[in-house]
């Protein structure tokens, strides 16, 4: 069965003190508010409304946890960079996301969504800089790749990969992804599955996972 298929919503938290005790390896999904994060999660899960909970009023500020069949957790972080959000709320989001990324021991990797037409914004770089010191892997999905023709899409992939490799080496990997065309699904599943193998060996995954 595909890794993310049949994911089930488990819990939402609004502040670091609300984080549940570690109970399985966690894979964080992050991205700008318009980067197609919810669509990517829904496509990977094969569920058109799995990430809908994070779109409902009052939920957009939350970290949402979804349990996978393998026992690991998909962790949907609040979208960042939405201009209409009051500054106070943006600071709260920033504190919540930064604390989670920097301190969560059960977090084994970050999947970061960037719009392939506008990748590597200042906020994208900040997100990577928050997480990179952990030494844990980062996988970048260049979303909405169907909006670009093959030549520009591949050029963007090569440019982003070159920039990130120059700075972070093999800690960061990059791929094209399209929720509309469902392209890139197997690649991201393979990458994340590779993260889960050492995590299970170290006891991060629940017994029987």
Curated annotation (Swiss-Prot):
CDD domains hit by this protein: YihA_EngB (cd01876)
GO CC term, one of those recorded: cytosol
Residues at which Mg(2+) binds: 38, 60
A single GO BP: division septum assembly
Cysteine pairs bridged by disulfides in the record: none
Needed cofactors: Mg(2+)
Domain of life: Bacteria
Keyword annotations: Cell cycle, Cell division, GTP-binding, Magnesium, Metal-binding, Nucleotide-binding, Septation
GO molecular function, one term: metal ion binding
Family under the similarity heading: Belongs to the TRAFAC class TrmE-Era-EngA-EngB-Septin-like GTPase superfamily. EngB GTPase family.
Its biological purpose: Necessary for normal cell division and for the maintenance of normal septation.
Cited NCBIfam families: GTPase_YsxC
This protein's name: Probable GTP-binding protein EngB
Annotated source species: Azoarcus sp. (strain BH72)
Taxonomic placement: Bacteria, Pseudomonadati, Pseudomonadota, Betaproteobacteria, Rhodocyclales
Gene designation per UniProt: engB
